[in-house]
Amino acid sequence: MTDRSQPSNLRPPDDLDGWDPAWSRFVDAPDHAGTPRRWHLLDTGPADARRTILAVHGNPTWAYTWRHLAAAVPGDVRVIAPDQLDMGFSERTGVHRRLALRIDDLLALTDSLELTGDVVVVAHDWGGPVALGWLERTFAAVDSPIEITGLVLTNTAVHQPPEASAPTLIRNARRPWLLPRATVDTTAFLRGMFELSNPRTPAAVRRGYLAPYGSPDRRRAIAEFV
């Protein structure tokens, strides 16, 4: 794995509300196919922490979701929150990454990071299925250096029966004529997330969530996640 810390136009602005620029880390690590990809991580360090919290975001967010968690943990606890590939400030790969690929990607990343020891997994939204898939594979590896000591899931799905339909909002968003307009051509899907928030999302926080998604090319994976 190679750190890529050189300045880039595609890094979180230093003045985002609640964001510490020192948390940003760029690394080159493989994806599911072994292709080197550029990942952006929220990483509080240190590498020898007594516990690591692996935090996995959902859609349409990025590691900014975990800013309060990163600020609250004691100094001997490390938070690692990757921007999933094609999301946040991580590389746009041009590959439609379905759930199985995202699980493989996360496994490849944690292997490259040489994650070991006491690990608590925290996940939100689509990060839940990705994190649970990662957990299942990690538990199945008899020689894994990782000891899972906790799991926190928020606003996610653990299991959906085959006959169950998606929530109304998601079903509507998936309509072929609406999906690209709401998720790629515009920021409507992102802004809809804010409108569902109670209390209302402050403008400074909205700016934080919107920061990586300023153009249609950077929003394509939002549609693919839906």
Language-model features: locations:
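Conserved HGGG/HGGXW glycine-rich cap/lid loop of the alpha/beta-hydrolase fold
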Residues: L42-F89
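Conserved alpha/beta-hydrolase catalytic His-Asp/Glu region
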Residues: P161-A164, T183-V226
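Active-site loop/oxyanion-hole signature of alpha/beta-hydrolase fold enzymes
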Residues: D20-W23, V27-R37, L42, A81-A123, ...
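A catalytic-pocket lid/entrance helix-loop region that shapes and gates access to the active site
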Residues: A157, P162-T183
